């Protein structure tokens, strides 16, 4: 279910324990891929099964994102250990453009993948990370943000609602397609 969020300047929040958030770089590729794969390990339990080559599929896109001058990838750390990742992008929507078919005109922040390391979920890392990421997307010119999430994931539906996201549009699918018969 795609969700959208109107981006407003965030009030300064209290830091969750000693969480620090930083922009990721090329040296973080292996850790970023490992965290991104952890998303699919979890959603594979509640949605479509995870593919054995998930890391191979995600690696090149993360490499390209991390090689950008200012990657839209952030990491939350505690005591120097990476606990969470947010892989995002900026999307410019204009009438007649591909993005314009789905989004109102303007500069959008796209939240592609957010994951907290297994065993760390519920510890405030995702909340601290996204507070920082929303501010950074706003500074980068985004006036709104959007994301897609899997409604069968019981963690994401609660998390994103608490982050202020509301439905922009809804799409449904059935797997396998033969189940429609």
Task: Describe the residue ranges of each PLM region.
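Conserved GNAT acetyl-CoA-binding A-motif
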Residues: 1, 137-149
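Conserved active-site alpha-helix within GNAT-family acetyltransferase domains
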Residues: 1, 127, 151-169
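Acyl-donor-binding surface of acyltransferase catalytic domains
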Residues: 1-16, 169-177
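A short beta-loop-alpha structural element at the N-terminal edge
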Residues: 20-34
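Conserved GNAT-fold acetyl-CoA-binding loop/helix
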Residues: 43-61
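Conserved acetyl-CoA-binding loop-helix of GNAT-fold acetyltransferases
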Residues: 113-116, 122-135, 162
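Conserved glycine-rich acetyl-CoA-binding loop
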Residues: 117-128, 140, 152-157
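Conserved beta-strand-loop-alpha-helix junction that forms the acyl-donor binding cleft
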Residues: 146-156, 173-178
């Amino acid at each position: 279910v795609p969700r959208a969020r109107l981006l407003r300047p965030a009030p300064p929040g209290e830091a969750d324990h000693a969480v620090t958030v930083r922009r990721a770089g090329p040296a973080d590729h292996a850790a970023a891929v490992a965290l991104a794969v952890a998303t699919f390990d979890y959603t594979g339990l509640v949605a479509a099964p995870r593919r054995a080559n998930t890391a191979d599929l995600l690696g090149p896109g993360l490499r390209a994102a991390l090689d950008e001058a200012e990657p839209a990838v952030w990491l939350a750390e505690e005591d120097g250990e990476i606990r969470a990742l947010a892989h995002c992008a900026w999307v410019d929507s204009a009438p007649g453009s591909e993005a314009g078919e789905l989004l109102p005109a303007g500069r959008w922040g796209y939240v592609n993948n957010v994951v907290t390391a297994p065993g760390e979920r519920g510890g405030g890392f995702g909340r601290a990370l996204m507070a920082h990421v929303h501010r950074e997307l706003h500074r980068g010119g985004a006036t709104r943000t959007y994301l897609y999430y899997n409604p069968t994931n019981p963690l994401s539906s609660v998390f994103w609602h608490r982050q202020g996201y509301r439905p922009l549009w809804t799409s449904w699918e059935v797997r396998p397609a033969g189940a429609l018969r």
